[in-house]
């Protein structure tokens, strides 16, 4: 289910007709249709996760993370009452629930409570994800819903929308067009980047093996690189793969709140996932970028 508020990705259109996949245009913030099918597993990944888009649609962002989630949790309670309980319920939260951690909390463990603005331009996303986690914990405690919580850290790979307005999508768009990579910051903020194959493995492990009502970081611990270093890596790899000749240029961003409350560093501690789930991501950022910067992979972003 998806409202497709930002359009339908090409990779999903290509999967139409697959016998084990049904795609429906629905908005989870609306009442669920009746009767509902009997689902064994629920993955709630619906949401607006790109800063420019959740600033454009702040109320829809809040509604998806709270009201849409509540609808699915209530459905799970009703299923249990009918003797058809769901086996697992995965909520995609976010590493943004940590806000801008202090240096002593990098890498950031799940027990860190966060340093988050509740009124800034990112608050509609950050705070609704935090409250979504609270809903998951309460429904697990009060109703026995087998909720598990994943906190993604900068996942990337083939299939990202080129209009996503996040850093790798922005850089890839310029590479595809043969233009210089434009950076709207000083390039100093750092992130770790987890390739989609490793991330998806992590999500399924959280869903199947995670402890009920508990959060798990899904990302990779190293290397923690700056945005400038990321741009340099993409420029070099694209040059090696298909002769890209662009360079990195810096420009001021016309959007005044572009960097307001933007975390300076983002790096997960995944020791809990290793211990509970056997989660051990292994694809380096260089290897992931090389996989994601082939002409075929770049074409999947369009």
Regions found by a protein language model. Give the residues of each.
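Residue-level signal for the nucleotide or nucleotide-sugar donor/cofactor binding architecture
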Residues: 7, 56, 64-67, 123-126, ...
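Residue-level signature of the cytosolic catalytic core of signaling kinases
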Residues: 17, 104, 120, 160-164, ...
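C-terminal substrate-binding subdomain of Rossmann-fold SDR/epimerase-dehydratase oxidoreductases
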Residues: 26-27, 154, 175-302
């Amino acid at each position: 289910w998806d409202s497709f508020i930002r359009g339908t990705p090409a990779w999903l259109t290509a999967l139409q007709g697959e016998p084990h996949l049904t795609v429906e245009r629905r908005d989870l913030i609306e009442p669920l249709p009746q009767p509902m099918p009997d689902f064994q597993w629920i993955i709630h990944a619906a949401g607006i996760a790109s800063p420019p888009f959740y600033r454009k649609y702040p109320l829809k962002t809040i509604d998806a993370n709270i009201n849409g989630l509540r609808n699915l949790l209530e459905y799970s309670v009703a299923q249990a009452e009918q003797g058809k309980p769901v086996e697992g319920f995965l909520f995609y939260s976010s590493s943004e629930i940590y806000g801008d951690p202090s240096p002593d909390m990098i890498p950031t463990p799940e027990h860190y409570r966060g340093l988050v603005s509740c009124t800034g331009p990112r608050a509609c996303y950050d705070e609704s994800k935090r409250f979504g986690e609270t809903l998951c914990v309460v429904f697990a405690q009060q109703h026995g819903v087998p909720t598990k919580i994943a906190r993604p850290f900068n996942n990337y790979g083939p299939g990202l929308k080129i209009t996503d307005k996040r850093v790798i999508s922005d850089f890839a768009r310029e590479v595809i067009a043969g233009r210089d990579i434009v950076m709207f910051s000083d390039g100093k903020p750092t992130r770790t980047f987890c390739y989609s194959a490793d991330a998806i493995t992590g999500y399924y492990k959280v869903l199947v093996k995670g402890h009920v009502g508990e959060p798990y970081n899904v990302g990779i611990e190293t290397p923690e690189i700056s945005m400038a270093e990321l741009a340099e890596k993409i420029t070099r790899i694209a040059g090696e793969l298909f002769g890209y000749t662009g360079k990195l240029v810096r420009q001021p961003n016309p959007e005044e709140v572009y960097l307001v409350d933007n975390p300076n560093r983002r790096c997960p501690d995944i020791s809990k996932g290793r211990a509970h789930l056997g989660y051990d991501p292994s694809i380096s950022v260089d290897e992931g970028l090389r996989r994601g910067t082939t002409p075929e992979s770049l074409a999947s972003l369009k």
